[in-house]
A protein has these predicted regions:
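Active-site neighborhoods and metal-handling regions in enzymes and metal-associated proteins
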Residues: 1-112
Length: 112
């Protein structure tokens, strides 16, 4: 299915864009706006019910912070974070989600 394959490729493209855009000084909010705009430019919708794209990795899930509007914390201020865009084409039967964990080492983004 061409549409299905295209969705999987867009997920890869989104994770590549994370490497192109994110620095340890990028805020969770800046990443939220950049990646949501990138998703739209690719012709897709963000399906997450809260609109976020991932979160910090912490022992207590109640202490998570999210890649969302209003979060001014810098990516480099957390030990690990997920990037997990949940996307779809408008009016499609398919949705896509790829989740990876990332961290910074000397300002270089690393995929766990």
């Amino acid at each position: 299915n061409t549409e299905w394959k295209s969705g999987l490729l867009i997920e890869e493209k989104l994770h590549s864009e994370l490497f192109n855009y994110a620095t340890s000084n990028t805020t969770f909010e800046e990443l939220y706006y950049h990646m949501n705009e990138f998703i739209k430019k690719c012709g897709y919708l963000n399906l997450d019910f809260n609109g976020n794209l991932g979160h910090s990795i912490v022992k207590n899930k109640n202490h998570r912070i999210y890649i969302e509007n209003g979060n001014k914390k810098k990516l480099g201020n957390v030990k690990y974070f997920t990037f997990e865009p949940h996307i779809s084409l408008p009016n499609s039967d398919y949705g896509y989600k790829k989740e990876n964990i990332y961290y910074f080492n000397n300002d270089k983004l690393i995929e766990l």
